[in-house]
Amino acid sequence: MRRSGSKESTIVYSALSLAQAGRGPEALALLEPLKSTPINSLELLDIIQAVYDDQKKGEESFVFWEKFLQTYGKQEKNLLAYFKASIRIKSLSHQRKAAVELQKNFPSRKHTLWVISSLYLLSKKSENEVEQRLLKALAEKTAKLIFEKPTGYIDSCEEFHLYLDVLLLVGDKDRALDALIHQDADRFVDADADLLLRKLELLASCARWDSLFTFSLSLFQTGNTDWKVCKALLDSASNDDSKLVPLKDCILKALSTSSTKRNLHLLWIEASARFFPEEHESALLGYIKKLYMKPIVFEDLRPYLLKLNVDAQHRLLDAFKLADLGESNESQKVDKLYAEVLLLKIHFLLFESFTAESVVDYVRRCFVAFEKGLSLSKGLLPTDFTHGYEALLLAVHSLIYMWEGNKDLKPAEKQALIFDAICLLEKGITYSQHNFHLKLPLIRLYLLLDGGFPAAAKVYDTMSIKQIQNDTLDHYLLTRATTYYPSSVTSHYINSSLKIYGSNEFETPEMISMAYEDGAYSQIEDMRNFRSRLDHSTWKSISLVERARIHYLTAFKPPKQYLPKCSSPKDNRDLKVFADYGSDKLPTVEESLRNSPKPDTLWIHLTVIGHSLVQDSIVNGDFEKAVLSAKEMEVLCENNDLSKQLTSEEIVHMKLLIQLGLLSVKVKNGDYENSSFETIENLIESFDYENSTPLSQLTKYTEIINDLITCLNSFLYHVSATKKKEFTRQYQLLKNISSNKLGSISGITKHKKKAARKYVSELLSNSWLSNLSETQVPYDPKFAKQVGEGMIDSYIQTTDAVSKLPKFVKF
């Protein structure tokens, strides 16, 4: 910059460098003088826009665009770049403006459709009623000109979708339906399944039950058994009793000719549940007898089975007999095995309690079924799931519910039950190496054991998680990852998890632009919603917090860019991917296997404010801001049940940060009271740990002490001269207490490392499965010891990571 003076490119690239280093305000200040002069390069405009967008000020960047267009003319190339820039920044107002300019200067049908789409999206987003009415009127008027006769026409299915969107936007459902049922629309409806489904939805929404039944019945009779078609039949019959007999006749006729179609059975089961209760049990039994070999059958039947009374449940089980099934060839043997597993699932669903006595016989039956499955799976590909693997999963679920619900078990016995479940799943994976149904609970089980994170991560690495799944599945491993394994390895996992959000920022706008170019209007709103869900993802915020924590705990002060900036988080975490066989009275297995409360918006807000209170406010001597942050945290703590999202150690951490924030200004002004320090002293003294304290708690205690010492160091620097001597005494007292606590943590981690083998040997010696007499467990003691060796390595790696933390506390 010194060499080139005010050269635009140098200033712009310098601003980009500052923004990437987390110095966003300085980057914006550097770009400010350029607002008065037109930028002569589209590339530089894109960089300027990216810098402003990084600071959540993307709208301001259009000052540069307007100057550019005024100076260099509204050529089509420039206006197209302006349109795409608007998409990148999610500015619908500028997108509409760019589309209007394109249509005005370069008239075409495509540009007019861009105007309609932009008006539609903008009116849906607008919160101003007057503006909303105006935008709707403009969208409707433009759509009428281009789509309706005599001036217009519809040229494709995508244009039809856009036309319907506008009509539904203005609340004209009847007009939209009339357009769909007109004979001119038939070729589009026949060619586009989504248009057909929209027609079904509009017929139901407009309460045209006769037309809905006739149309859906015609589809059904020609072989279309899509569930939305089936639902349309059910809805029309629900609103018109005269349709019940024809509905029953058409279903039974279809079942008589195609008895293995899943949706036909589900339609009959639902219809019998609603309209023909005397035939409901028969419908359920018919589905079981025809499709028992399909694993999905249990998931389909589960809600209906739970509604049956006990007598009906037992009648159903008695009516389906394994002895009636043939097994003269390999295929029949496999089918019979799936029937056996289905019955095991239903019995699991009907369990009232999971005591050791009630579980023993059931687990034995599961093991027998699993062994049968292995003998029948020898010809499968390595990527296939072994036959009957769910029998093993059912045994594991039994152990999990017994572990959770049996209060008489000693802690060592409960830990051993977890290890039993781990060994079962590890054995299952040796036969079914790509089975995520086994791997996800295995990850959670490892995390329930002290020092289990590296072992869990090793399993997670084998799952080949796609980038798109990072937002939905990474939470199974990485929730509170810093607490459970504070190392550079964790930082690597978190950075990998965050890559999808960078891809979303750059790739999704390009996909939206391509959709406009290709005229794929039905996809644009879905793409925008997808982009928004990732932009405001709850997991994104949690991951950014964890990245800040891991940098902070391992001697690196994180720049501000590491802190979450998204508001109104959208929770995309997949909590239902776990197989679930239990009744509604039980918590799901996913809930049972959580090693800590599920963090959500409250956790994010408290953690971000607390981190900022220490690193941004107190460290920099901005104590007035620290007080405001502390009061904000105080309100959040008072108005919420913290235990639903925070661990007990995190609650203590928040209380300490509130105390430090409120104390900061008083220390600076010299009007604090010694009782304030006594409160903090008592809080730190309450940290009670021993050799059996989990490593995760030691990590959190170290983090709390680190925050305390960081704040005390700043207080010592900023305290008023008149109180310096007195404060130094308080500082020294708290420092000594903290040093002793850190010394104890170091001593405990050393002891834990030495006792790693003893810890795992206790898991093996207390095994519940190995003590079951006359039970053939699917793994031998040698295999359990191999799993134990892996757990020892995991435990030692974790103790090494935790033992390093006290060294990074800066006194």
Curated annotation (Swiss-Prot):
Instruction: Supply the InterPro entries for this chain.
Output: NAA25_NatB_aux_su
**Broad class of where this protein is predominantly found:** cytoplasm
Record has Cytoplasm as a keyword? yes
Q: GO biological process: what's one of them? A: mitotic actomyosin contractile ring assembly
The record's section on Pfam families has: NatB_MDM20 (PF09797)
Gene Ontology cellular component? Answer: cytoplasm; cytosol; NatB complex
- Where are the membrane-spanning stretches? none
Subcellular location as annotated: Cytoplasm
Mention one GO molecular function. acetyltransferase activator activity
Keyword match Cytoplasm:
yes
Q: Which UniProt keywords apply?
A: Cytoplasm
Its assembly, as annotated, is: Component of the N-terminal acetyltransferase B (NatB) complex.
Q: Which PANTHER family match?
A: N-ALPHA-ACETYLTRANSFERASE 25, NATB AUXILIARY SUBUNIT (PTHR22767:SF3), N-TERMINAL ACETYLTRANSFERASE-RELATED (PTHR22767)
Q: Which family does it belong to?
A: Belongs to the MDM20/NAA25 family.
What function is annotated for this protein? Answer: Non-catalytic subunit of the NatB N-terminal acetyltransferase, which catalyzes acetylation of the amino-terminal methionine residues of all proteins beginning with Met-Asp or Met-Glu and of some proteins beginning with Met-Asn or Met-Met.
Q: What is this protein called?
A: N-terminal acetyltransferase B complex subunit arm1
